[in-house]
From Swiss-Prot:
This is Sperm motility kinase 2A. It comes from Mus musculus (Mouse). It comes from the Eukaryota. Keywords: ATP-binding, Kinase, Nucleotide-binding, Serine/threonine-protein kinase, Transferase. GO terms for molecular function: ATP binding; protein serine kinase activity; protein serine/threonine kinase activity. The gene is Smok2a.
Length: 504
């Protein structure tokens, strides 16, 4: 891990947690649930200003939760890679923390493989190289995911891979050993199942091997009717490889799933393997900015018409504040890029809709969507602020389970078929007596999500916003579209009409 990221991590811990409350519903409209993860939920929401769909992870704040060294939000704040899900904004209320993230328009790798049966080596290579690039970036940042699996890997329509759900992630120093045992059983490395201190990056390498095996065979390498048999298989490293696989691929899988972590290669070494570099050794550019440090003047001008200040936009991006301004800029930029990539075609005009104003038509912007000076702005959460949040990804439905004393709990029904394995292989949160005190009256809070919404979660009108917010949403959408020369001025937006896949 570089000194820069270490200093950034120290800043994250040194700052006090943010204290201001901000109403989530003033900025986002809830559309439905797209994923569950134990106590957390992932919601589909619409950004009111831009009309763009986003994914919102809702994390309850509970006193008896495990308190990890770094929260999922802090890890995502550190990450800026094209193959890692982008965090846009963080909003905290008295009971919950909202992580607003980009929405992947595609399928999980599990569903992608389920539909295809298995992938040919060329397609598997293209996806796997993106995974390697992302995990190598994480290694350089000192981040360990600890729960890589097909459910936590999204494949977008253009073939781009996105790693999601860093709920079990952690930041480590070079050579640091970990003792908290967590993850998904069939994807766990032998040293984890043996309850030994382990090297974080090496368990991600093992899991990459299991994921690659799944991609090219359509099944996981280890299957058994009981946890004990499954554990023995993984510890012994016993699995079969179809003879149709190439020699180089067979060799790579064997390297990745080396039972001795000392002999297991690093991600950088895997990236140099002949099977990986076949055809083209080009990897996704880790320097490709997902969140730009310098704003586009045209977007700044458009945002200025609706009340945003240019200096505030620049500061929010440069300091990565993850506030309303930063989220609005990133979503507007994404919307603009999407419109520019769309083929030019005439669209029928709706006679009942007033034509959108353009940026050059300045008189039409004098009633822009401006905020009052007294209105609380987005939470000023910069990349050096701390959150005491512990997001975890577990199953929506729980099977009978057994517990490792003081360590972790895992499902007991592990069966050979892919569907049943997918149902039973769920993530397990870190449970350690040193970090977690179980509240005896947790049942009341566990049912909180099934009762009526609390007052703070009910939609309220945004203060300082004029009536007709839908009209202004359309205005800013068209204003951004005017910035792209390849889009006709009379084209209507189709944002939100694409089918999206849930993320866990």
């Amino acid at each position: 891990m570089g000194s820069g990221s270490q200093q950034k991590s120290e800043k994250l811990r040194s700052k006090p947690p943010f204290s201001e409350m901000e109403n989530f519903h003033a900025q986002y409209e809830m559309l439905g649930t797209i994923g569950h993860g134990g106590s957390t939920k992932v919601k589909l929401a619409r950004h009111r200003l831009t009309g763009t769909h986003v994914a919102v992870k809702m994390i309850p704040k509970r006193e008896y939760w495990c308190k990890p060294l770094m929260s999922e939000a802090e890890l995502l704040m550190m990450a800026d890679h094209p193959n890692i899900i982008s965090l846009l904004q963080v909003i905290e209320t008295k009971k919950k923390v909202y992580l607003i993230m980009e929405l992947c328009e595609g399928k999980s790798l599990y569903q992608h493989i389920r539909n295809a049966g298995y992938l040919q080596e060329d397609e598997a290579r293209a996806l796997f190289k993106q995974l390697l690039s992302a995990i190598n970036y994480c290694r350089n940042q000192g981040i360990v995911h600890r729960d890589l699996k097909p459910d936590n890997i999204m494949v977008e329509k253009d073939g781009r891979v996105k790693i999601i759900d860093f709920g079990l992630g952690i930041q480590v120093k070079p050579g640091q050993k970990l003792n908290l045992f967590c993850g998904t059983y069939p994807f766990s490395a032998p040293e984890v199942l043996l309850s030994r201190p382990y090297d974080g990056p090496k368990i991600d390498v093992w899991t990459l091997g299991v994921v690659l095996y799944f991609m090219v065979t359509g099944k996981i390498p280890f299957d058994a009717a009981s946890i004990e048999k499954l554990r023995k298989q993984i510890v012994a490293g016993k699995y079969s490889v179809p003879c149709r696989l190439s020699v180089k691929l067979h060799h790579l899988i064997t390297l990745l799933m080396t039972d001795n972590p000392e002999l297991r290669p690093t991600v950088a070494e895997v990236m140099m393997h002949p099977w990986v570099t076949k055809g083209s050794g080009v990897f996704p550019d880790p320097c490709e900015e997902q969140i730009p440090l310098k704003p586009d003047p045209a977007i700044v001008k458009a945002m200025g018409h609706i009340g945003f200040q240019a200096q505030d936009i620049e500061d929010s991006l440069r300091q990565r504040k993850f506030n309303e301004t930063m989220a609005s800029y990133c979503l507007l930029k994404k919307q603009l890029l999407k419109e520019c990539d769309r083929p030019i075609r005439a669209q029928p005009m709706n006679p009942s809709v007033t034509p959108f104003p353009s940026l050059v038509d300045t008189p039409t912007f004098h009633l822009g969507l401006r905020r009052r000076e007294t209105e609380p702005t987005s939470l000023r959460l910069s990349a050096n602020r701390q959150m005491s949040v512990c997001g975890r990804s577990t199953s929506k439905k729980r099977d009978r389970s057994f517990s490792w004393p003081g360590v972790l709990s895992r499902p007991i029904n592990i069966t050979p078929t892919m569907d049943q394995t997918h149902t039973c292989t769920r993530s397990v949160p870190c449970i350690n007596s040193n970090f977690c005190i179980i509240h005896p009256n947790s049942s009341d809070e566990s049912t909180e999500g099934h009762t009526s919404a609390s007052a703070e979660d009910k939609p309220v009108r945004s203060r300082g916003w004029p009536r007709g917010i839908k009209g202004w949403t359309s205005k800013i959408g068209n204003a951004m579209r005017k910035l792209c020369c390849c889009i006709p001025s009379n084209e209507t937006s189709h944002l939100g009409q694409r089918r999206v896949s849930p993320k866990k």
